[in-house]
Amino acid sequence: MKSKEEELIEKLMGENEEFRNAKDTHSQLARQLDEMERKPYLTPQDEIEIKILKKKKLASKDQMERILMQYR
């Protein structure tokens, strides 16, 4: 059985382009972070890139949460 939150997310994925774009961006950034963090050695530039990706990922998560709050 799906929670109300999951049902709302499914609804927004179909109806709200801004939410869909934020979720797609969040997923893409998560994949990029996974790839970067799997490296056996991180250069200082890699570490900076990881911090930037994490901030962007958090911003997209915040955007999704703001949209969810509007529909609750």
Question: Where do the PLM segments sit?
Answer:
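Extended, charge-rich alpha-helical interface modules
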Residues: 1-72
